[in-house]
């Protein structure tokens, strides 16, 4: 058990008050007593972003995730995909340098998953945010990633890191896509 030390990101100590990291979890998480707009604004208020900047960021995120008409709705009034879009908008609204996503689409059906994956690609392109996307879904990893890190069954052991040279958006039935998916599958089978 560590008793002392530092956590570094890009060589800089992580300070909870100044960190520029956002998170999206498998379980969509919204504050039930806040509206969609207030949920998206939450991280901006914690970071003490000016009202003008917060207003602009919230408007931009509502537009990008297609929830402008639902800004005054509460989480109990939203579908699962809408709740996940709120989580995505809240995470990107703070303009993080690093976004950690842990199985964010695990509970969604395939159509919603594809739609949100495409929205996520648009956000990545627009913001330039570095994203660590954790998934058990090989096709999702190949579809979204620039690099694929295959872990072993030991928590901190990396089996390999593969570059994904396929251009975005990716064609899931192309020979190149299928070949890379099969390569990742083979790596997982043989540890």
Label the predicted regions:
Residues 37-45, 55, 59, 163:
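Short helical segment in ABC ATPase nucleotide-binding domains corresponding to the A-loop/adjacent helical element
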Residues 99-102:
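Catalytic Walker B motif of ABC-type/P-loop ATPase nucleotide-binding domains
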Residues 73-76, 94:
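Conserved signature/switch motifs of ABC ATPase nucleotide-binding domains
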Residues 113-127:
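Helical segment within the ABC ATPase nucleotide-binding domain
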Residues 4-16:
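Conserved ABC transporter NBD signature motif
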Residues 128-134:
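Conserved H-loop
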Residues 24, 88:
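Hydrophobic anchor residue at the start of the ABC signature
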